[in-house]
Regions:
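Right-handed parallel beta-helix
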Residues: 67, 96-97, 131-144, 181-193, ...
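Structural detector of coil-to-beta-strand junctions
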Residues: 80, 120-122, 146-147, 164, ...
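Acidic, glycine- and Ser/Thr-rich low-complexity intrinsically disordered tracts
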Residues: 27-35, 107-113, 117, 306-308, ...
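Extracellular beta-strand-rich solenoid/capping regions of secreted or surface-exposed proteins
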Residues: 49, 53-59, 72-93, 99-136, ...
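N-terminal export signals
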Residues: 5-23
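Acidic Gly/Asp/Thr-rich repetitive segments characteristic of extracellular carbohydrate-active
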Residues: 32-67, 77, 82, 377-386
């Protein structure tokens, strides 16, 4: 009860009131319907959210193409773009190099620590979104611990869905909340910061997941958090599947675990948290992923997690405050780790991984510039860059 009371206090006192909503858009003239492609198109200066709303009302055209450029919030708010049940089944796809950012220095408070961010989350997936909803081909960046909104009312989620403090605080790049199970492909989540957790992605299924959020061919790079899950956080009772993803340069534990300190127990204070954190009653299914050059690899207190044909290599990056040894995997139940290559300062922090079905201290993978291992021993394991589909990468 003390912890719940404290979290309510965080939500009420540590975040500022709503100053404006990201719904305010006046550039909808850059959104058009392409009947031949059966898709809506958004050009630079246009409103992606307006296109999503149009597609939500349109029974025949459920694709939104966003053309090359950088898309910023037009106003302070809780998300640059958001998906709810009415948006289920829409594919939002980048055409060319498309950046979605939380930053807008023209309207941000340049004296605030969060400058130049003006939204809590770059992308929000809310209650009622299934795996038929697809986000593909974007770069997601710019979150910097900006937080607005309190309580149970939110412009990006139904009043009927309960809001935890982490609804507002976590998931600077992408927040996945309640019964939301999107499919996210070829997305690069880079350069985000949040406190306490989940700077790149925060998945919060509120304890009763009916499915898993799906990530394929994604990159998580240079994300930072005050406490846990620098790149990816699976909060209590959540599920995610990650296939062919890269984690590099992510740092957790930048400061004190202020939630743990005030509620009777810091989270993994000695060795800290990894690029990916899996909390109790959660499950991660990870295959053909690479974790390298992070503050730590993975910490997993979940149930039934699997890590298959993945690479954990030298996750010893400096930057956090935990004084214990850096580690590749810290997992309470290691039976699901198999056919993986593991090497670092501490390979298996808890000694729970079966060495007979994994390779400890393998040869140097000799990563190239895209983190593809050149050593032949690694031919069947780890991340490989996905070839961009012609539909999403050509000029239209």
């Amino acid at each position: 009860m003390r912890r719940r009371a404290f979290l309510r206090m965080v939500a009420a006192a540590a975040v500022e009131p709503v100053r404006g909503l990201a719904q305010r858009r006046d550039a909808t003239d850059a959104v058009t319907l392409d009947a031949a492609a059966r898709a809506y198109r958004v050009q630079p200066g246009g409103s992606i959210q307006a296109a999503l709303e149009a597609a939500a009302k349109d029974p025949a055209n459920k694709i939104v193409y966003v053309h090359a450029g950088t898309y910023r919030p037009a106003a302070h708010g809780q998300a640059l773009i958001w998906f709810n049940e009415r948006h289920d089944g829409i594919t939002l796809e980048a055409v060319g190099e498309v950046v979605l950012t939380a930053a807008n220095p023209a309207i941000a408070d340049n004296k605030a620590p969060s400058f130049p961010a003006v939204v809590n989350h770059v992308v929000y997936f809310g209650d009622g979104v299934s795996t038929k909803t697809v986000l593909r081909g974007f770069r997601v960046t710019g979150a910097k611990n900006y937080t607005t909104g309190t309580g149970q009312r939110s412009p990006i989620e139904s009043d009927d869905v309960p809001k935890t403090p982490f609804f507002y605080l976590d998931g600077g790049g992408i927040k996945i909340y309640a019964r939301a199970y999107p499919t996210i492909e070829r997305v690069e989540v880079v350069g985000n910061y949040t406190s306490p957790c989940g700077a790149g992605v925060s998945v919060e299924h509120l304890g009763r997941p009916l499915d898993a959020a799906v990530f394929r061919d994604c990159i998580f790079r240079d994300n930072r958090t005050q406490v846990t899950g620098a790149a990816f956080d699976l909060l209590h009772g959540s599920r995610a599947t990650l296939d062919n993803c890269l984690f590099v340069g992510n740092v957790a534990n930048l400061g004190a675990d202020y939630i743990g300190l005030l509620t009777g127990g810091e989270y993994h204070p000695e060795h800290g948290s990894g690029a990916m954190t899996v909390f109790e009653r959660s499950r991660a299914e990870v295959s053909r992923c690479t974790f390298t050059g992070n503050w730590a690899g993975v910490d997993d207190n979940g149930t039934g997690s699997t890590y298959v044909k993945s690479i954990f290599w030298n996750n010893t990056l400096k930057g956090g405050i935990s004084t214990g040894a850096r580690y590749e995997i810290d997992i309470t139940s290691g039976g699901g780790v198999r056919e993986s290559f593991i090497h670092g300062e501490t390979n298996d922090l808890r000694g729970t991984i079966d060495r007979a079905v994994n390779t400890f201290d393998p040869p140097d993978p000799r990563f190239d510039a895209q983190f593809v291992p050149q050593a032949p021993e690694y031919g069947a394991v780890g991340y490989r860059p996905a070839a961009a589909a012609s539909r999403g990468r050509t000029s239209r």
